[in-house]
């Protein structure tokens, strides 16, 4: 099957809310909820120092979508516990898991291991909804193109990240540290 066709099929059934059993493969996609608790005080101390801006008037430490969110695991059908898993992270500016779904499916089928799709801080489903709404973001894209000379490739996909990091580059470090704490917590939760 062509990869673009399979990507569309997986995208159509992917859910953060309910378990999906792949009818044509011996796999299922299970959603799990994550509530950040490891490193919270340290991260909040940093985040409280960050200024808000016109793009986002909510302080980083008050963005609830970043603290409590869902992640998914591709796993062989019916398996309960495995000794090994593959952690699949994403790149910057990613808004959805679409292109990673076929990768996760392939890795799980080829290895027999669970594949965890875990979002890094302030990406994917860890952001307010208006950060990935094209209609809401297009005025910001136009504004960004006016503010930054020779900027030709600004799109709604990267405008949230661009505004937030240009305004306060320290956000990149703090988000990385927050993601590290989240992964540490995830690994501890998986082991118990």
Question: Language-model segments: which ranges?
Answer:
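Repeat-unit-sized solenoid/scaffold elements
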Residues: 1, 191-192
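N-terminal cap/lid segment of alpha/beta-hydrolase-fold proteins
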Residues: 3-5, 12-81
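Charged, low-complexity, helix/coiled-coil-prone segments
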Residues: 43-54, 117-123, 127, 161
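Generic low-polarity alpha-helical segments
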Residues: 56-62, 116-123, 176, 190
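Short, charged/polar micro-motifs that form catalytic or ligand-binding hotspots
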Residues: 61, 87-101, 166-176
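Alpha-helical context
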Residues: 65, 83-84, 91, 98, ...
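Short, surface-exposed "cap/lid" segments of acyl-processing enzymes
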Residues: 70-146
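Alpha/beta-hydrolase active-site loop
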Residues: 134-191
């Amino acid at each position: 099957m062509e990869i673009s066709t399979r990507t569309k099929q997986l995208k159509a059934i992917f859910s953060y809310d309910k378990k999906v059993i792949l009818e044509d493969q011996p796999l299922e996609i299970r959603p799990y909820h994550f509530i950040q608790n490891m490193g919270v005080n340290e991260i909040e101390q940093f985040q409280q120092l960050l200024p808000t801006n016109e793009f986002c008037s909510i302080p980083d430490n008050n963005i609830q979508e970043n603290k409590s969110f869902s992640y998914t695991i591709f796993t062989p059908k019916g398996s309960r516990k495995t000794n090994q898993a593959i952690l699949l992270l994403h790149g910057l500016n990613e808004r959805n898991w679409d292109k990673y779904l076929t990768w996760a499916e392939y890795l799980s089928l080829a290895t027999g291991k669970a594949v965890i799709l875990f979002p890094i801080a302030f990406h994917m489903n860890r952001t307010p909804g208006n950060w990935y709404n094209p209609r809401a973001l297009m005025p910001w894209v136009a504004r960004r193109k006016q503010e930054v000379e020779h900027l030709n490739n600004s799109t709604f996909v990267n405008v949230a990240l661009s505004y937030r990091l240009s305004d306060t580059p320290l956000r990149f470090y703090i988000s990385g540290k927050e993601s590290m704490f989240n992964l540490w917590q995830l690994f501890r939760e998986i082991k118990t």
